[in-house]
Each structure stands twice: as C-alpha cells, then as structure tokens.
Amino acid sequence: MTTSTSTSSVSTLNRECLCTTINPAALERELAAALGDNELYRSIRATRPHLFSATAVFVTPGQVDKMRAVIEAIETVIATPTYRSAALARASSAAAHDPHSPGVFLGYDFHLGEHGPRLIEINTNAGGALLNVYLARAQKACCQEMHGLTTGPVALAALEEEFVAMFRSEWRAARGELPLARIAIVDDAPATQYLYPEFVLFQALFRRHGIDAQIADPAELEIRNGRLLHADGTVDLVYNRLTDFALEEPAHAVLRTAWFDDLALITPHPHAHALYADKRNLIPLTDPEWLSTTGAEPVVIETLLQGIARTRLVERAHAETLWAERKRLFFKPAGGFGSKAVYRGDKLTRRVWEEILAGEYVAQELVPPGERQVQIETETTAMDGGSAGREAVPTGTNAGAVLRPTAMDGGSAGDAGAVLQSTALKYDVRCFVYAGKVQLLAARLYQGQATNFRTPGGGFAPVFYPPVNEASFTDGGSAGNEGAVFRPPAGETE
C-alpha cells in the first residue's frame, strides 16, 4: 500500500485480506507488562472471547482527513452561543453546571461507505481506548502492504502518557495547580461490566504515574465534611463510566451532590453529554437553515451536511410520513447509548412503532456500515458433509456449521473437524477525541443491526492507514512521526 492509497484499494484489502494480524503472545505480554501478571489476559480469553477481533480494518488517509474535518466542524458550531444555549435548554438541570473542563474520551462513531465517512453518533463515555492501545501494539504485519501504516496521529508508545496528561489537563482546567492525588473509576457493579478489564488497566496506569486509583460502585462513595470519600480516602477526580448521563438515578445521589457542590471533578460529565451526545443535537447539526443562524462559515456547514447522517425528531404530527419512509431510517432513543432500544426501520412492527412514538426518539438516515471480510473457524457436521481436510468453506450460508469463538487466539484451523468460513462482518470506526483533537482510531466488527461483542470473529480491531498529512490531523503530528507508524513486533515473522 502506498501513501496514495485509494478507496478502491482499501476496499479490496478489507474484502480480500483474510489474514490474522493479532499476535496473541504479544497481547499477553502487553497486558502482563501493564499489570505485572497474565491473569487479565486469561480472564479475557475465558469470559470475553469476542472482545478483540483477530484482524484489522484498513482506511485511507482521505477518509481519516474527512473524519477529522467533521469533528473540527462540530467543535466550531458547539463553541457558538446559539448552539450551546439550544442544547442546554433541552437538557437536564445537571447539564447547566459547567466544570470548565471538556470531558475525557469523546467517541465519534462513523460509518465508512461509498459516499465517504458519515458520523452516526457521538458518545461522551466512549469505552475501549486503553484496550485498543494494547491491541494495536500486539499486531503483526501479514503482508508487505501493512508496512509503514499507523493507527492514529499519536505514537502508540506515547498514548498511555497522552491519556494520563488528558486527565491532568481536566484537573488543571477545574482546579488549577492543586495536586491530583486520587481517582475513583466509577460504574454500577463495576466487576460485572463487560469492559471491566479496561477499568483494571486504567487503575494500574494511574498508579504507575503516581496517582492513587480505586475502582468503585457509586454505593461505596459517601460525602463527609464537604469531601467525597471512598474507603475513608478523599476522591479528587471521578472517572465516570456510568450511563446515567444526568446522574438522576437514586443510586447515584451522592455523585449528583458531589457534582452540584463541586466536591470532586467528574469526567465525563453531564455538561459534555448535553453538548455532544444527546442525539437530538444531530438534528440542528444537519439542518442548513439552523446552522446558518450560528454564524458558521459555509464550508463548515457543507462539511457537516456531507459528513453527518441526517437526523430528525420523531413526532406524532409526522408519524405517517416517517412510517412511509421507515425502510430508509434508523430509530434511536434521544438519550440512549449503544444498541439499547435502537431499531432499523425495515424491521419495525406496528407495536414497536407505537412505543417509539410514545417515547423520545430521533429518526436518522440509514447509512450502511463498512464491511470487512474475515475468516472464522467452524466445526463441520454431517449436514454439510465437511471434513477436517477441507481448507475453506465458500462465503454464504452457515448451514451445518457451528461457529467457534476463536477470534482472540487467532484461530486454529488445524483442529480436527474444523474448517475456515469466510464471512463479511460490519464495522464502524470510532475516533477517540479530547478537546477537539483525535488521539486514536479503532474499529468494532459485528453482525446484527448494531455493534456488539457477541459476534465470532468480531470485537475491537485496530484501524490502519498510511500516515499522510499528519500535521493537519493533530497539532502534535507530522508526516515524519515514526513513532506512530505500525511495525511488526520485534522477533516476529511476517
């Protein structure tokens, strides 16, 4: 692959490169180096076999540049008083409180189709950044085309430092030069969360940088003498992984008080969610007439209209029109997250449609995700007459095949009774962003109508592209940023 990589050549790689790029031994070493043992790696393999895909996704520098342009255009509009007053007016009371910090780990999720990248949604508690750092470091070059590729504008070796600096920047923005001594990583029943391994990795990362860190359920927090406490120790900063974005649930009352009374810095926070992640924000961001009232330049408006899936509010007054157009629409709850209660219009029943009309939903233009061809190991049965000696099963129906969850260990086609099935998985690309600057790109491979971690061969995957025009992608980048370039791990064959 050359620096003039075209969309067609990248599509060919995503369609025809069936190589396994993950190096399980390297991933085990990365996680063991972070934690001091390999227990986390073993736990992930045993309990989360579809967390990591065994393959990578390829994109072009042009696609990356377009995603960056959309992100910058959104930041430009969000900075305007017109936008901010409109977004906060429809948000919860908690959102009105401004901590004067941007909030860590915004996730801009894109579908990459034939008409270029289109933004689907923005998340303010985007998970997976640190997991994807270790995953990207554990890749091996499967072919000559992979040489010289990068996974983002920041060098992989520098990303952990970048993330810690981000939290320190949040702290300084709100607290000045006061020392940041203790962080609580907070979620409901954290040990049961699918991304709990990332909590453990962040805890270790903070501690390596001289910051005490604890993983806590909100019920373990208390307020005493004007301080937020966990296990009798003062909490300076809460790394908030909750999906109660307005801190409205009774179980989060202590955090809500700490938020309003500035007893601790909470990030990501309700203010950022109201400005970025409420899906109703995508309505004005794809309305040219409204955008013109913000004072945005024509080039900014055009970038948004081309780069964001058009979004409308679901209202009973327009129910008949929306129902007629439903096959071209995707319906999402305005304050939702992930795949919870989302529906493809062509799958809707009248009963579900009535539930949508009774709730707060947006209707978004259906933008198909990209596709990545992968090989998954299957066990043949008498139904397909298969044998262990067959090299591959053609793409198509899985009749008679039992999928084997081998994504994380790269598969083992030599197992008795196993063959390789070629199948197409969908993918989206997530840009992890802080203060308007992209830190890392990652993909999620899946089957079904929305991303999940239940698909054999699916899960997080690194995104590779030639490092062209890095200087325009981030303030700290340059075309000669050798630290960001993908190279095979030392001692590994290609």
Residue ranges, per PLM feature:
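Preference for protein termini
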Residues: M1-E494
